[in-house]
Amino acid sequence: MLNAVENMASMLRSFPPEPMDEPVDFLLAMVKGRKGHLAIKAGDAQRVGSLKTLHDGPRPSGYETMRKQGGIVLGVGGDNSPWGSGAFFEGVMTAGFSSEEADAAVMANVVAAGYAIGD
């Protein structure tokens, strides 16, 4: 599984996505793919309407073909070491390539969950 995490991190570093406007306490992120195409979105999980497309176009060099080997990792880290940072709260995998409307609805639902830092 660690190889899958490292491969994804390497792939994402191979092109410069647009940065988020400002740091957030809770981040919602989506990675969507189909043949020859990759979309990455992120937004503030406490603010409706903040979902931003960071990349929507061709896959990075070396990842043009969808090779589906390996494990699926949802979370922070992947090798059970204590060196990861952050916290992972929820994850989901779906089939197909979701519409803009579906992505916005998911974002609104996450915001409605009311993630907050306690006192």
Question: Residue locations for each model-derived region?
Answer:
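Extracellular glycan-associated modules
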Residues: M1-D119
